[in-house]
A protein has these predicted regions:
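Duplex nucleic acid-engaging cores and interfaces of nucleic-acid transaction enzymes
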Residues: 2-6, 12, 16-276, 282-383, ...
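Long, highly charged, low-complexity intrinsically disordered interaction regions
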Residues: 17-18, 22-32, 378-458
């Protein structure tokens, strides 16, 4: 566990340093890299901090602020911010220039507002403070899209829900995100009881803007309000939802990994003759018998259930097989028809008495994937695909790890939301679990399959 944690942390730091070098190179090419900025970038200990620092220097489309700067309005914005006793309307008169499309003082002030809004929204330290405030205080609200109630009935628990961002359980967050992606739910951030006020106050205090009755205070307060509502609120909402998604995915992937570990490390039934039954109704129950080493001895299909209802014939065959091959275990897949098949085997046990084998319900997750795989085709080239699944069911009772290692971990079905998380991270995590389990248990070089040996470290 410690080695895996170290491996993940090392990977993160390598990605962080690679991104750091890219950012330093980009800013240096812009001739804007100061020693102070370089020190801040080199000291950044997270990708979020790194991107916040890089934000003002990112190549972006021509903004209203850039147009205003090109029109010579930067000094106006700087002057009002530096000295709030200046009258904005009067000061802006000196920047009226018809050739630059600044026909009135209002045009000049609008340009200055755009410059300050962009400046206020690009401060790395302010972004970090606002993001932390949001994480601590904000609520996440989900509502059903009008007219989608019937179509989205499976999401009814989230039609009207509001919960703290930092405490929402991962499964609930992933369900809401799925509902939003499917167009059933719409989500919003409820910032605080006083809605936007605390965040606007934070922006104002960071830039030393406070309404003290001075000539420019009202105008500057309006700039702060616009900065939060137009630029920062949506930006931070995206960042906070991303944080919820990442935290939920990490938690869910951890649960999936533990589920897979439990499956792989389930106690093996051992080297015993096993009857594997892959239940089915219309298509019948696929039956196979494997010897203690997993070698295939017998295949047949029985039809005890509807619509065929050949119960007695199927029962007689099961009893006959158990006696002839001295079957010690019966592995019954847990798919469609499992309960009815279990009843059939129970009746066979009663007829066999003291020599009856033990019957066990086995998860058949991934058996169909294995059946159609190249590995199964190489192992059983002449065997019908439908029987390969029954062989897998029988063998995974004998030795779960040795059999399940042949199946792609994601195909084993380890969790409800496994398709909603990062597939790259999920695959990496589950592959690590399989490798750890194999190396924890060890392998017998004389009998281990190639897929099992491939998971041995080194």
């Amino acid at each position: 566990t410690q080695l895996r944690t170290l491996e993940e942390r090392l990977g993160y730091l390598r990605e962080l340093n690679a991104r750091r070098e890219t950012i330093l190179d980009s800013i240096e090419k812009q001739a804007k890299l100061t020693p102070e900025l370089a020190n801040l970038i080199n000291a950044a200990d997270s990708k979020t901090r790194l991107e916040d620092l890089y934000l003002p220097y990112k190549t972006k489309r021509r903004t209203k602020a850039q147009i205003a700067i090109e029109a010579g309005l930067q000094p106006l914005a700087d002057a009002i911010l530096k000295d709030p006793t200046l009258d904005p309307e009067h000061t802006a008169q000196g920047y009226v220039n018809g050739e630059l499309q600044i026909h009135h003082s209002k045009d000049a002030l609008d340009g200055a507002k755009q410059i300050l809004m962009e400046q206020f929204s690009l401060s790395a330290d302010l972004l970090a403070e606002l993001r932390n405030m949001g994480w601590q205080d904000a609520q996440w609200r989900s509502r059903v899209v009008d007219g989608k109630q019937q179509e989205g009935a499976k999401f009814k628990d989230y039609f009207e829900l509001q919960e703290a961002l930092k405490t929402i359980p991962s499964h609930r967050a992933l369900a809401i995100l799925r509902g939003r992606n499917e167009g059933i739910l719409q989500t919003t951030i409820v910032w605080s009881e006083n809605e936007h006020l605390p965040y606007e106050s934070k922006v104002g205090s960071y830039w030393h803007i406070k309404d003290q009755g001075r000539a420019a205070d009202k105008w500057l307060s309006e700039v702060v309000r616009w900065t939060w509502r137009v630029k920062l609120a949506s930006q931070l909402e995206t960042a906070l939802i991303s944080r919820v998604r990442e935290a939920s995915e990490d938690s869910a992937i951890g649960v999936f990994a533990n589920n897979l570990k439990d499956l792989l490390l389930a106690a093996p039934a051992g080297d015993k003759v096993t009857l594997g039954l892959d239940p089915g109704l219309r298509t019948g129950v696929k039956a196979v018998i494997v010897d203690p080493t997993g070698k295939l001895l017998k295949t047949e299909t029985i039809f005890p259930h509807v619509p065929h209802n050949k119960w007695q014939a199927a029962l007689a065959l099961v009893v006959h097989w158990c006696q002839t091959y001295q079957v010690q275990l019966v592995a019954i897949g847990n798919g469609t028809g499992s309960r009815e098949t279990d009843k059939l085997v129970k009746e066979a046990q009663e007829k066999l008495g003291a020599t009856a084998p033990q019957r066990i319900i086995v998860s058949e997750a991934g058996a169909s994937i294995y059946s159609a795989s190249a590995l199964a085709a190489a192992e059983f080239p002449d065997l019908d695909v439908s029987y390969r699944g029954a062989v897998s069911i029988a063998r995974r009772l004998q030795d779960p790890l040795a059999e399940l290692v042949k199946i792609e971990p994601k195909a084993i079905g380890v969790g409800q939301y496994q398709h909603d998380v990062s597939q790259v991270q999920l695959t990496r995590k589950l592959d690590n679990v399989v490798e750890d389990c194999v190396n924890n248990v060890g392998v017998d070089l004389n009998t281990a399959s190639a897929p099992l040996l491939q998971r041995v470290a080194g």
